[in-house]
Amino acid sequence: MTLANFIIAGTEKAGTTSVFTYLSTHPSVCGSTVKETDFFRNGYSGDHSNDALQYVKYFANHCGQKTIVMEASPGYLGSGMEVAPRIHALIPQTKLLFILRNPVDRMYSSFNFHVGKLNIRKDMPFSEY
């Protein structure tokens, strides 16, 4: 059964998408069908057999014999207290990479990303965000 053995976590607007994309180009690496599976926040039930069957869907049909099978879900960092034991229960040998960014730079990037998308006025200054 093919499950992730490498997870990229971190925070929003820190580069998880870029790292996921770059690593996915390596011939030994297989990325999940959806970059942010968020499985261990939203899909995990605590039923080991069922969870494995649900999680494998992100990798089973395209990873073949790749050595590194990965996903990237930035939301895992903020939910660490609940997510860490879930990851350990299902895939205890997996490696995790946490990507962080200067908080001010991350917030400014988030502001620019969300302007016009989350009911944030396009003319709102960053200082009001």
Task: Show the residue positions of the predicted features.
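PAPS-dependent sulfotransferase catalytic core
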Residues: 1-78, 86-99, 103-129
